[in-house]
Amino acid sequence: MDKDSKVVIIGAGVFGLSTAVQLAIEGFKNVVVVDRHMPPVPDGSSCDISRVIRFDYADEDYLNVSYEAYLKWSKDPKFKDIFHPSSYILTGSMTGGDESWIDRTTRQLSNKGLAWTKLDDAATAKSAFPILSGKLAEPGFKGYYNDAAGWADATKAIIQLRDECLELGVSFISGPAGTVVGFDTDSENKIRSVQTLGGISIQGDHFVLAAGAWSSNLVPMYNSTLATAQVIAYTPLSDTEVQRYKKLPIYANFNTGWFNFPPHADTKTLKMAVHGRGYTRTPSKGEALIEANISTPRVYPSCERPNLCPSEGEGRLRNGLREILPELADRPFEKVTMCWHTDTPSGDFIMDYHPDYQNLFVGGAGSGQ
């Protein structure tokens, strides 16, 4: 690619911004990021108080990439106020169907010479982490923990990426002028420009679609992805409780999909979520560019995630909290909401050129990973 060519990136989340930074570092002089909102985009899946940083994967390639990322998060001084080390427990019940997944993960860790500690039962887990007061994943408990893990303050990370983009000369277009509603193509299905809600055309030589769950609004994904909303809750904590639970590990139950974070000191909340099949939403008529049976979040207005989630989802959140900290399980949540994921059948990312457009590269499908 000619480094004087213009690259237009659709989406100002972690995929789009990190792509922009890398292109600028490699010498591309004309990189433009377009989105409905300047980052951090308030309803984007990259933005919130926390995201898990781990390298525990059953797939060797994902483990290698995520381990490299973990080393950068944990050792690079620029992440000192963003990355927070924490132990990570992966557990579940052997009565479920996913027992082999934990075995494959620990085997990959061992093959790479990375430490992990087996947890034979709930009592062993409580001995290692006395703050866990619930019954945990019983009966048939199976699990392990890894001390080389942690979490990142996601919104702070996005702000840092945005500022790095600006320092490197990346341009941003937001608001109606940055809300993409269509493409102008030539006779060979090569995109010449994107059309926006504000009525302007943004020309480019190369285009990157990194719009997360909104991507299927713009191009057909041919059943390769499904946008799903996952439930999240935040329990308020007192100053004393923030200190009491500060050594709480990240605990993930692979049977239920429930997981938590340690307390977030800035907001004085304990965050938890469920990563499962999620909820879908059918767009209203005319909302999506693609006339197909798709699931998608609202396109506009771009706004903070609403304080609501299905009652069934709230029940799963409380059940998971009761599993590890029953003393907090009936406390009113400060907020419940939903985060939109782009899931693939295999849980793999998609990084490839779109089959319908010569110069459109699709990056994303994070699948909640």
Residue map of PLM features:
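Flavin (FAD/FMN) cofactor-binding and adjacent substrate-gating region
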Residues: 95-175, 181-190
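Glycine-rich FAD pyrophosphate-binding loop
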Residues: 24-45
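Glycine-rich phosphate/pyrophosphate-binding beta-alpha loops
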Residues: 58, 149-151, 340-342, 360-369
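Conserved Rossmann-like nucleotide-cofactor binding loop
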Residues: 15, 39, 214
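Core beta-strand elements of the Rossmann-like FAD/NAD(P) dinucleotide-binding domain
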Residues: 3-5, 196-206
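Beta1/beta-strand and adjacent pyrophosphate-binding region of the FAD-binding site
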Residues: 2-15, 32
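Dinucleotide-binding Rossmann-like beta1-alpha1 core, especially the glycine-rich loop
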Residues: 50-131
